[in-house]
Amino acid sequence: MSALGQVLQRTMKRLFVLIVLLTSLGLQAQSYDTLSTTTISESLLRLEEMRTAADSMVLLQSNAAQYLLKDSRFQLRQYAPGSVATFNLGGANSSQSRVLWDGIDISSMASGVLDLSIVPGILLQPSSVVDGSNAGSFGSNGMAGGLALNWKASGKREFSTLIGLTSIGGLSFGVLNGGHFGKVNYRSFIRVQESSNTYPYSLGSQDYTMTGMGFNDLTFMQQYNGVYNRAHWKSDIWFTQSEKSNSGSILAAGSPSLLQDRALRAKYSWQKRRHKISAFIGHEWQAYTDTLNVINLTDTNTYRQYTLQYNYNTKNTKNLVEVGHVSAGGTSRDAALLNVTAKHEIKLSDSWNILARGAFWQDKIYGAGQFVWSSKHKKIPIQWSTGSFYRLPTMNELYWNPGGNIALAAERSYGSKVSALYQVNDLKIGLSTDQLIFNNLIQWTPLMGGVWSPVNLERAYTSSSSLLVQLVKGDMNNEVSVTHQYSRVLVSSNSSSRGKQLIYRPNFQVVHTLDFRILKGRLQLRSHAMGKRHTLRDNADVGILNPEYWMDIAYSYSFMSGQVQLTGRVHNVSNTSKTFIPYYPMPGRHYSINIKLNSKK
């Protein structure tokens, strides 16, 4: 047997022993608290957003990146509307936060992130955002922050046509259809959209027009579910295709690039009593063409993911074993790895939960764990958690040619989180604060010869605190979302970044939403404030993005007994210069209209 085979055999034996020990602990602990009325699935204190009439329309006709701007915990990174969108959430960066689809981690293990511009908003639930260290308890590779995506075919008959127009060259058309035949429920969603993204912007005292940042995409989703022999089953398919142009920054325009992406994801789950089995297949193809003068450089890559997940849940425990095979091929890397995860969560009492998680990746075993304490106070629930999680190196970081580093260590977090919720009558107040230390932060750094390579450079500290206040009085809805972030690099091999703030973390972010009835419709006023951000690791002044303030106005109206719903919006009313990435200005004041045509019930 080869040396690699011997290592794999020994590793799998150790992982099997770990799974057996975790499972036996869970079975032994079931007798400790069999009278508890709170299930383990309710162990995390998660805040739900307030959705207005305008939000419901945006949810159907936009992507997750655009919709989540209403949440101050979410910090977007995007060149232009519809372009590739990544995010910072709860103090973490994009690769440290995970995106789950019905419990399956679909964040690419090739790049480490998922482009939120191709995630339809319809997959977002009111409690989809999980901030801070609690994200590690529901993902297989998360450290801090994440999104839980899902949607459901309820069997309710629905047929809606969706139309959207924008003043910057955008057009979208979609259809949402649902119902049932026999005992099988179904729901389908298809949407096509495009935009030239032609909009004015200012640079100093000069006015210009943005061009060359257009995009188009297609999204199709279909779900069937039902019950057979007392077992619940569900099948999903999700297909996306997109093209995104990038004319370059306003300082280096004239070197356009084109990103083409096709992704097919399919999932099937079967659940009977305490047992649930899920299977997932994901295939993605991507081509990036960079135009430099007369030379076109094209980088084509593929990514495949196969995941089989088994869940065994009791009243006081959750047990998970997940086996995945991921491969990345194409121009710049060609590799495949096995990923095995075992997770055990146990409710020891009404107050205490414990989570243990282990993974096999790149012939190594990684471990993580968390303690969660919840108060018994029903009016003011308080929760405290502390733990340590990991972020595994991605395929690109390990095998990118040239520059990959197979000797990378996994990133490691140590953190503590406190959350509290207070609700009385029409007032709801939620507060959370996270303190995290990250070790072995992976950063791409230029080496000798100009080749960039990922290395474990730094240790950093982040503190993220969020306040959510919701007040409903009659026909008026009021929500304030506030997030404050503090970060510092504690240890670094690069002296210029030691003691500096992490990049793309605004020191504060505030979103205020006021929604009320007027003239038989609903008017929504949404104000945004975003603090200073550093975009250079040495925090040089030239890389500072100054604080920005802007407001959006939306008016929603329905008629013909609700068969026609109309929402008009004025974006960036104050015509503020908005920038998420330096030298890529976002649109100033512009307009949009969304129409939803519902069939008769």
Feature map (PLM): residue ranges:
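Short acidic/polar hinge/loop motifs at secondary-structure boundaries
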Residues: I104-G132
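Extracytoplasmic beta-strand/coil segments of soluble accessory domains associated
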Residues: A65-D105
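N-terminal periplasmic "start-of-domain" segments of outer-membrane beta-barrel proteins
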Residues: S31-A64, T86
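Outer-membrane beta-barrel signature, preferentially recognizing the C-terminal barrel domain
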Residues: S97, A252-K267, P381-N439, T445-K473, ...
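N-terminal periplasmic accessory domains that precede
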Residues: T39-S41, S62-L68, A85-N88, L114-P120, ...
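Gram-negative outer-membrane beta-barrel transporters
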Residues: K318, H344-S351, I429, Q435-I437, ...
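Conserved C-terminal beta-signal and adjacent last beta-strands/turns
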Residues: N177-F181, F189, G214, N225-Y228, ...
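Periplasmic-side early beta-strands and strand-to-turn transitions of outer-membrane beta-barrels
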Residues: K156, L176-L259
